[in-house]
């Protein structure tokens, strides 16, 4: 123990305290264990609360010890001793009565506050927090309200990086929350994943806090975030409490978080539980306060509509109303129409009352699919299947087509163009209908040309007659493949005794192709997204329906381009991979985006003589501030060591966006896919391992360990210093949009006011290790970085030598990342456009980070103005 410490602790000589702060830090921390032992003896003395000298000695010694530990970076070595002293202090009362009989902080409380602040200063060190948190939680039982408040703030801060350490105390924390320590609510989402059972057991009491007036909005958002996590993990626990959430759907502050809960339940196939909230969702959709949430509300309403036919009609009515009110917003309108089409594919009757509205919309593929489920010309002719009766089927058909299928005759369709319309999904009763024809064919003397290729179209065209699809039993009319632009010519065979022609408006569209093989089974024709074309040459096919005649169709040969398109589409492995995993991809990308964002752009840098490296670029996702740093003109970029993972994520994000916006999968022929594939091909074989791009992206999704590697890479690149996750809208904001008041000086007119100034030590030149540090006074403004050998007044700053911010190529920390140097933890390096560099060292790490951040922001705004 240092002799000055000994004089203070053993002899209580307060005059030695002034000299103690001039002693070297390393001399102070020598023989620390004896020092702490002496401190505990003084603290536990019964006379300590009344002895002012002892109180002063303890406060001085603790202040000097914590300062020495902090400056020498030895907190991990002495954390156990500090925590032990804190535990001893907490055994004493934290309040005492003053002369006016009021509760005030006791001398022990002051020591506890100092120790807590010193320990939680290192909240990012898990070894320190593992020791500190169990003892700090004891402070929450204190009768001192101020100490409880400060400890709660410390624990909330530590929970960000130490969720596992806190999770073992989850029940204790939940109990404190329920009893009134509402500030601890912010901790709950951080510890749920590591210890779920206490939350499930106490969920009812936690949800009741939403109605408590003392709980502020941010704390309610944390509760809803916790509920969303429960919905993703164990939805059956949350579903009984859903009615309590309904009232918050119309709250502008809480609606987004509640909609996230609903989306989580939908992803877990619990949509039926949300049907009771459809009236409230309709009110939210019609309100102008929830404009930003309309796309999400639209998706939730559509998913509820797919639960039953009754809900389908109600949902379509609301979606059509939403479409009418948002005709000027193409992106939202497209999302609404996609959801309407999805409901219509299951319950076509829900679309009938809105036929006129759909016809007024501009023609598009989505509108064609919607109209493909509607009967525009023959709504008054419902067709039914009665007990699978073939006779009833034929009688109904004859009412529509006349004697299109009759004994002794043959109706021939000559189509001069190949069909160009899209395929719709195969009706679920197509198989039963086809089996009726098969059974009748086998029992009767049917005349047919061939069993080899028998095809027809089932479903309804945009301009063709068809029957509506009922809820439990549907029947699709038989129509020959044709497009709305194809002329249909009917010719009756000479042996036919009577002839009937179809109405002039009849122009059926091919909706679904099926074929009958030699085994007599009817199957959908395999293919891609476009209708199956007929093979080269004139092919005549027959579909036996009853005794006597058969219906025959002739199709012209495909041209070479269409045939090539179909073959490539059928072989599109990427399309098939994504098509079968749509929901999985959307859920996966949603989870990934909460951990880190996905790049908006990738480039490959390098020449023939240098190693190629991929650069990934990120932008601010909200751009809510006019002084936003990372926009389309200027992106946050760095070279990555894991191009395969990033390209895989970019591919999944591309598919997720295509599915969400257009309801379709982006195949290998899309421009975005080809761009990503080109980046992959530009990388060296040592990186790609000669793996094809489509093989790489159709492999298993990157797991949590792979994601941790990317998070570490982002951290080393300084990404999290400039971007933060906004939990209210699940977007990554740049520092300018999160705190616009901090960067306003960079974008103000003039740009000459100082933003940051102070002394920095500088080194220049190639052989920097041979030179000594030169202390200079630097001033950073939005215009330039000025420096001199001494402090200069503002009016003389323009005459100082300066570095143009637009000429700075990059700034990097020398105390962070893989190549960090322990001797330069307080330093950062500036690279300029003329290939020169300058190393600057601040007085401490905090000051170095401040300079680094301000320089990055100033550079970004300078480059944005230049572009």
Swiss-Prot record:
Span list, region Disordered: 480-505
Membrane topology category: Peripheral membrane protein
Organism: Caenorhabditis briggsae
Protein's UniProt name: Protein melted homolog
UniProt similarity note: Belongs to the MELT/VEPH family.
Compartments, as annotated in UniProt: Cell membrane
Transmembrane segments: none
GO (cellular component) term, any one: plasma membrane
GO biological process: regulation of signal transduction
Domain writeup: The PH domain is required for membrane targeting.
Signal sequence annotation: none
GO molecular function: phosphatidylinositol-5-phosphate binding
SMART domains recorded: PH (SM00233)
Pfam families: PH
InterPro entries associated with the record: ARM-like (IPR011989), ARM-type_fold (IPR016024), Melted-like (IPR039888), PH-like_dom_sf (IPR011993), PH_domain (IPR001849)
Sequence ranges assigned to domain PH in this UniProt record: 753-860
Keywords assigned: Cell membrane, Membrane
